[in-house]
């Protein structure tokens, strides 16, 4: 079982879209005290808020913000018990060198390339994860094999942080809009203790 509880203090999705993944976690767990999300697209952000209300999530029990998660994170000072995400595959981002002084990216010594923000999202989520938290993120298979900066970041996550718990391969054509195969990566902060 991904989340070993029938109650979560909070759950966060940094690329929440319409909020369906957050609602799925709430349905699966049963009790989630607070739901957090961030979405870049204004229309989809409004849809996520409506979706929460339509699924009986009281407005005081969710905090969904509209902005660019990598450039202007809206929940940066919080740590979450559960993080779930299906970020857009291979999306571009600024990769501005100023981010090397950002706590989300600095420990790795390298930034995800501007042509693929996959590892920028992963390191953002690791930064936001509570010390006993669990994260589940859908990523393209390429994050397992690409070299250069992504290889450096991947090695640091596995060898230094020891956050990677499980990888589940997913078939091609599973997600609307992309035919490439994907994977579900599960990370647990508690993996650090199992070295």
Where on the chain are the PLM-derived regions?
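A generic structural signal for short, solvent-exposed coil/turn residues
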Residues: 29, 56, 177, 190-192
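Short, small-residue-biased leader/transition segments that mark boundaries at the very start
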Residues: 1-2, 193-195
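Conserved S-adenosyl-L-methionine
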Residues: 3-85, 90-92, 97-99, 105-108, ...
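C-terminal substrate-recognition regions of SAM-dependent nucleic acid methyltransferases
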Residues: 129-130, 190-194
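Conserved Class I SAM-dependent methyltransferase catalytic core
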Residues: 111-186
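Short, compositionally biased segments
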Residues: 3-6, 185-190
């Amino acid at each position: 079982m991904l989340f070993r509880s029938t109650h979560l203090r909070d759950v966060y999705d940094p690329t929440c879209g319409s909020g369906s993944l957050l609602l799925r976690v709430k349905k699966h767990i049963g009790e989630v005290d607070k739901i957090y999300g961030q979405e870049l697209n204004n229309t989809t952000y409004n849809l996520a808020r409506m979706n929460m209300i339509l699924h009986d999530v009281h407005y005081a029990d969710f905090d969904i913000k509209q902005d660019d998660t990598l450039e202007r994170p809206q929940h940066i000072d919080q740590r979450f018990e559960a993080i779930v995400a299906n970020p857009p595959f291979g999306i571009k981002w600024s990769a501005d060198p100023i981010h090397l002084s950002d706590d989300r990216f600095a420990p790795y010594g390298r930034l995800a390339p501007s042509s693929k923000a996959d590892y920028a999202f992963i390191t953002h989520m690791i930064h936001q994860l509570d010390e006993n938290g669990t994260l589940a993120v859908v990523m393209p298979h390429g994050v397992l094999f690409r070299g250069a900066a992504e290889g450096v970041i991947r090695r640091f996550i596995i060898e230094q942080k020891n956050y990677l718990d499980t990888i589940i391969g997913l078939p091609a054509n599973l997600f609307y809009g992309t035919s490439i195969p994907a994977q579900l990566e599960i990370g647990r902060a508690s993996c650090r203790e199992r070295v």
